[in-house]
Curated annotation (Swiss-Prot):
Keywords: Coiled coil, Membrane, mRNA transport, Nuclear pore complex, Nucleus, Protein transport, Repeat, Translocation, Transport. GLFG repeats lie at residues 22-25. It comes from Chaetomium thermophilum (strain DSM 1495 / CBS 144.50 / IMI 039719) (Thermochaetoides thermophila). Component of the nuclear pore complex (NPC). NPC constitutes the exclusive means of nucleocytoplasmic transport. NPCs allow the passive diffusion of ions and small molecules and the active, nuclear transport receptor-mediated bidirectional transport of macromolecules such as proteins, RNAs, ribonucleoparticles (RNPs), and ribosomal subunits across the nuclear envelope. Due to its 8-fold rotational symmetry, all subunits are present with 8 copies or multiples thereof. GO terms for biological process: mRNA transport; NLS-bearing protein import into nucleus; nuclear pore organization; protein localization to nuclear inner membrane. This is Nucleoporin NUP57. Belongs to the nucleoporin GLFG family. Residues 1-52 are annotated as: Disordered. Residues 25-52 have a biased composition (Low complexity). It is a peripheral membrane protein. Its main location: nucleus. InterPro entries: Nup54/Nup57/Nup44, Nup54_alpha-helical_dom. Residues 218-239, 280-321 form a coiled coil.
Length: 326
């Protein structure tokens, strides 16, 4: 086949036409021969330059684009690089770059029961456990943005529950305070009043029991002394000399009153006016006598009242009233 191509006549074209004709066998004999020669020369001169520029461009483009067969020593294949990037963004993959350890608070005696999860590195979990802020904290892996969002939502829900509990506690405290003001305060006041009444009755009952218990027993020293004082007061009240002294004081008071009336009559008979008044000496004597008698009367009155009071107390202690019939 190649020999036949080489022995093809010089005037015949690729499709069997003469060189004098066109590409589809058309005749070119009518064109001048002088015009065809310069055109052929220009095409022959421009063809090498165009071919050389295309070769240079293909070499530059081939050097910049990746070819499947051309691999370097420091560059991984594109599918492997894409898979590596996807693994770093995947929160469920061990090679995820967006991960850290947070801490949850638990009971201290339950800390040994916790351990790393299925997608966690035990070594990293142990390192996080050593860096825990307190003995009752455990590390929890948080990888990717979904884990952070889930933890924030959980914290927000827990805070909302705590706020609801606080509102319930405040409402309960308000109700307790209101009930205390309306009910317990009144009950406490009534109980205090009843306590005072019962204390008074218990004291009175204890005094009566003590008197009944000591009846028939010998008196103590204080009781004997009090008895002697009461007997002396009773004797003083019943002493005839005391009555005679009272009669003497009354008589002296009557005499003094008569003396004052006599002085008044004498002043009126002598024509002394009220504007002149009594003499200073007479007024002083009369005033002194009246003051002395008044002091004596007050002293006697005070002694009588004290004796009467002591006698009533003694009578209450030694003659208690009979208990009321039930």
């Amino acid at each position: 086949m190649f020999s036949s191509l080489n022995t093809r006549p010089a005037g015949q074209s690729l499709f069997g036409a003469n060189t004098g004709g066109g590409l589809f066998g058309q005749s070119l004999a009518n064109q001048p021969q002088q015009q065809q020669q310069p055109l052929q020369q220009q095409q022959q001169q421009a063809a090498p330059a165009l071919g050389q520029s295309q070769i240079n461009q293909n070499q530059q483009l081939g050097g910049s684009l990746w070819q499947p067969g051309s691999l370097t020593a420091y560059q991984k294949p594109i599918p492997e690089q894409i898979k590596l990037i996807v693994d770093k963004w995947n929160p469920n993959h061990p090679n995820c770059a967006f991960k850290t350890y947070l801490y949850n608070k638990v009971d201290e005696h339950t800390v040994p029961l916790y351990g790393p999860g299925p997608n966690e590195d035990p070594k990293e979990w142990e390192e996080a456990l050593q860096r825990k802020p307190a003995p009752n904290f455990i590390p929890v892996l948080c990888s990717g943005f979904p884990s952070i969002v889930a933890r924030l939502m959980l914290q927000r829900r827990v805070i909302t529950e705590f706020n609801n509990k606080l509102h319930q506690i405040n409402a309960s405290l308000d109700a307790i305070l209101s009930r205390h003001d309306l009910d317990h305060t009144v009950r406490a006041f009534n109980a205090r009043r009843r306590h005072a009444e019962l204390s008074r009755r218990c004291l009175h009952l204890a005094a009566r029991v003590q008197v009944l218990r000591n009846r028939g027993y010998a008196l103590s020293g204080d009781e004997d002394e009090l008895k002697q004082k009461l007997q002396q007061i009773d004797k003083t009240l019943n002493d005839p000399a005391q009555g005679s002294r009272l009669e003497e004081l009354w008589s002296r008071l009557i005499v003094l009153r008569g003396y004052a009336e006599d002085l008044k009559d004498q002043i009126n008979q002598a024509g002394i006016t009220e504007s002149d008044g009594l003499g200073e000496e007479i007024e002083a004597k009369a005033k002194k006598i009246l003051e002395d008698y008044d002091k004596q009367l007050q002293h006697l009155k005070k002694q009588v009242e004290e004796a009467k009071k002591d006698f009533e107390e003694w009578e209450k202690q030694h003659n208690p009233a009979p208990a009321p019939a039930r």
